[in-house]
A protein has these predicted regions:
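Conserved, mostly hydrophobic/aromatic
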Residues: 47, 144, 197, 257, ...
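Divalent metal-binding segments
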Residues: 2-5, 12-243, 269-303, 307-320, ...
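Short aromatic-centered micro-motifs
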Residues: 20, 262, 488
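Structural motif
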Residues: 22, 45, 448, 490-491
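Non-cysteine beta-strand/loop elements that form the S-adenosyl-L-methionine
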Residues: 60, 254-272, 356-365
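His/Asp/Glu-enriched, well-ordered alpha-helical/loop segment
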Residues: 184, 301-312, 316-335, 339-340, ...
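P-loop/Walker A phosphate-binding loop and immediately adjacent motor/lid segment at beta-alpha junctions
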Residues: 469-500
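Short amphipathic alpha-helices and their capping/turn segments at secondary-structure boundaries
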Residues: 46, 146-156, 238-259, 343-355
Length: 500
């Protein structure tokens, strides 16, 4: 394949080039019109800006595919409103041709709600239909009595709120959809991701998803739209080791085993992220907590590393981040900390010194700005501190944590650079990234000979957009979030094209 009349992102000369792709690699880059085209598919991008394809370094892909079909609770500003939204959904479901046995809503953010979540509130409006509402951070749910009964949940009869490891177990039952259905939803989500310039994902689905991806690629019959690294969780570590799995092992074309993932603490919205200092605005001294004893976390990380797995460790609170960094340092481990939302001032330099990457989700800062200003108001300058990580030399990679935030790298990039959306004033702009940094942290390759044939063509130049609109960050944020992608090529195969 030859991508002709391409303007490389950041090329000051502005000269168009032909990019020759062969066997999944960039074979040559020559002046536009000079490539030998006979026998090649030629794609004319008409002087559009071309850059490397984008990666989302942290997704839960099946959950995201399902989330796209669930009741949207993002705008619910109270428990009562969320219950009313679900009541409407129950009514619509009952009148449908094939009603779902469980009605699921997703995306509520209750950190600042004034009223309490109770089964009584939900039961009064949803009746005998099992209803489950999933929080925006996917660390808890709120269920009515019918749902508690259906899934055999013990306790929680007053509030219907289930959190952390108990919720993670329940979520697997909710995600138990037949293979044909879920594979169709996943493929739809993959095509949509490709339309936003995504060429690869790190899939941290909370089950052993390797067999699922092998099946999907085999049934697709062509190069799947995404390159996938699929993770492994503690519950499946022994099985994965027994099966000979290790990070980097190819399972199918474009599918490899990804990292070992462990969730060490909770989240900010549920006030379960483990902190050095107590949460503000919470009765008593509440610090959050680890999901596992420290010695168990250490033992699992050492065992996974010994078995050949890369390490990806969820840590949100500053105490959890300190603990994980201590474990890495003590055992000479390397890997990534996922989220790193709150970090002690003295721990920023440890990321670079210990060779620990920060896998961060910039849109969470925009989602959680108001909650942060309540519960972490006395430490907000250390929250979602991307600039501090970069200035201390940390390797930073960007992702969405979909379904927590949408799987769209342009939303991620916009949040990283502008620290705002919906016209609000930027939040702690001093912790933002430059547009060049955000783009670099969203890619794994460059437009050079010998690099992977992963590239995208854009209908606008993101560097120019930010330069032109930089004085109005709200407009710059909107422009980046909506930036059109004309062409996506992953491993030398076209996975999306529009008007080219």
């Amino acid at each position: 394949m030859i991508v002709t009349r391409a303007r490389r992102l950041g090329d000051a000369s502005g000269q168009s080039v032909d990019i020759v792709l062969r066997d999944g690699l960039i074979e040559a880059i020559v002046p536009a019109g000079s490539a030998f085209t006979e026998g090649h598919e030629v794609v004319d991008v008409d002087d559009r800006v071309v850059m490397p394809g984008l990666w989302d370094e942290h997704v839960h892909f099946s959950l995201w595919a399902q989330h796209r079909r669930q009741v949207n609770l993002h705008h619910a500003d109270s428990a009562a409103q969320a219950a009313r939204i679900m009541a409407d959904a129950v009514e619509a479901n009952a009148s449908s041709e094939n009603p779902d046995p469980v009605v699921i809503g997703a995306g509520y953010r209750d950190g600042l709600w004034k009223d309490a979540k109770t089964t009584q509130v939900l039961d009064a409006l949803t009746g005998d239909t099992p209803v489950v509402l999933i929080s925006v951070d996917v660390h808890s749910c709120w269920a009515n009595t019918a749902a508690l009964d259906r899934f055999g949940v013990v306790g929680h009869r007053d509030d219907g709120v289930i959190t952390e490891r108990e919720w993670f177990a329940l979520s697997q039952q909710l995600s138990d959809v037949d293979a044909t259905t879920i594979d169709g939803w996943v493929l739809d989500a993959a095509h949509h991701a490709a339309s936003r310039g995504v060429v690869g994902i790190v899939d941290l689905e909370m089950t052993l998803s390797a067999p699922d991806w092998i099946r999907r690629v085999a049934s697709y019959g062509a190069r799947y739209p995404l390159t996938v690294e699929c993770g492994v969780y503690p519950e499946d570590l022994e099985t994965a080791i027994a099966q000979g799995l290790r990070s980097g092992l190819e399972l199918a074309p474009g599918v490899t085993v990804g990292p070992f993932k462990i969730i060490t603490d909770g989240s900010l919205n549920t006030r379960t992220a483990q902190c050095v200092e107590p949460y503000l605005g919470v009765e008593g001294e509440h610090y959050g907590a680890l999901n596992w004893p420290t010695e168990d976390i250490e033992a699992m990380l050492v065992a996974a590393d010994k078995a050949g797995f890369w390490l990806a460790v969820h840590a949100i609170g500053d105490k959890a981040n300190q603990t994980v960094l201590d474990i890495f340092e003590k055992n000479d481990l390397h890997g990534r900390i996922e989220h790193a939302q709150l970090v002690r001032a003295e721990d920023f330099e440890r990321f670079a010194r210990l060779g620990v990457a920060a896998s961060v989700q910039p849109d969470h800062a925009i989602d959680d700005r108001d909650v942060t200003d309540v519960y972490w108001a006395d430490r907000a300058e250390r929250a979602f501190a991307l600039r501090s990580l970069v200035e201390h030399g940390a390797q930073v990679v960007l992702g969405s944590d979909a379904p927590v935030s949408p799987l769209d790298p342009w939303i991620t990039i916009a949040s990283a650079v502008t620290r705002t959306r919906e016209g609000r004033a930027p939040w702690h702009l001093e912790q933002g990234l430059t547009i060049s940094e955000a783009l670099s942290f969203s890619t794994r390759s460059t437009l050079e000979v010998g690099q992977p044939a992963d590239l995208i063509a854009l209908d606008a130049d993101p560097l120019w957009l930010v330069d032109a609109l930089g004085s109005d960050l709200a407009k710059a944020s909107d422009a980046l979030r909506e930036l059109p992608v004309a062409l996506t090529v992953a491993a030398g195969a076209i996975t999306h094209r529009h008007n080219v």
